[in-house]
């Protein structure tokens, strides 16, 4: 039976109670205030819903993650990064990045990054928890991604690209920086060929929960202003 969250209670049901079909649906309802979002990520779940649906919370099993030391970069992409005209920054245009991620996609109808969702993550950015990666070409924002940094973990949310390989360049730059900062794991949530091409792989939900317990409260050397 699916748990419906109460507004005055920030707790989530145990991860092992998530539904098998659809895979990982843990709870419904609640809200997107910062306290609940932070509680969700600490617990091992994340919000995802389409416009017109109730707010849904997910913890899939298995969970797709990328260990920074396992990053794979193709020779063609590495060449583009060396000789291309892209410039990558952090936290310079968070609102614009999340708007880009919410834009229309050729392969999907609608967006799960609704206006309330955008507003919620902008608030987390203002709190110093959510961060963006921007990819620029001739002064124009052509790609980027955003997510949350908590302890030694980064929770990736979405990315977009308006130029060839722009989001890939941003993602690789982020992973290499996270590796320098000593991050242990990047949460990719669900498997895609795109992420798997970089070395992302699936681990049991229980192993993901163990990683949360081990790394969430460890201080990192991250400097997003650099």
Swiss-Prot record:
<dbReference type="InterPro" id="IPR042221">
    <property type="entry name" value="Leu/Phe-tRNA_Trfase_N"/>
</dbReference>
<protein>
    <recommendedName>
        <fullName>Leucyl/phenylalanyl-tRNA--protein transferase</fullName>
        <ecNumber>2.3.2.6</ecNumber>
    </recommendedName>
</protein>
<dbReference type="InterPro" id="IPR042203">
    <property type="entry name" value="Leu/Phe-tRNA_Trfase_C"/>
</dbReference>
<dbReference type="InterPro" id="IPR016181">
    <property type="entry name" value="Acyl_CoA_acyltransferase"/>
</dbReference>
<keyword id="KW-0808">Transferase</keyword>
<keyword id="KW-0012">Acyltransferase</keyword>
<dbReference type="GO" id="GO:0008914">
    <property type="term" value="F:leucyl-tRNA--protein transferase activity"/>
</dbReference>
<dbReference type="GO" id="GO:0005737">
    <property type="term" value="C:cytoplasm"/>
</dbReference>
<dbReference type="GO" id="GO:0030163">
    <property type="term" value="P:protein catabolic process"/>
</dbReference>
<dbReference type="Pfam" id="PF03588">
    <property type="entry name" value="Leu_Phe_trans"/>
</dbReference>
<keyword id="KW-0963">Cytoplasm</keyword>
<dbReference type="InterPro" id="IPR004616">
    <property type="entry name" value="Leu/Phe-tRNA_Trfase"/>
</dbReference>
<comment type="function">
    <text>Functions in the N-end rule pathway of protein degradation where it conjugates Leu, Phe and, less efficiently, Met from aminoacyl-tRNAs to the N-termini of proteins containing an N-terminal arginine or lysine.</text>
</comment>
<comment type="similarity">
    <text>Belongs to the L/F-transferase family.</text>
</comment>
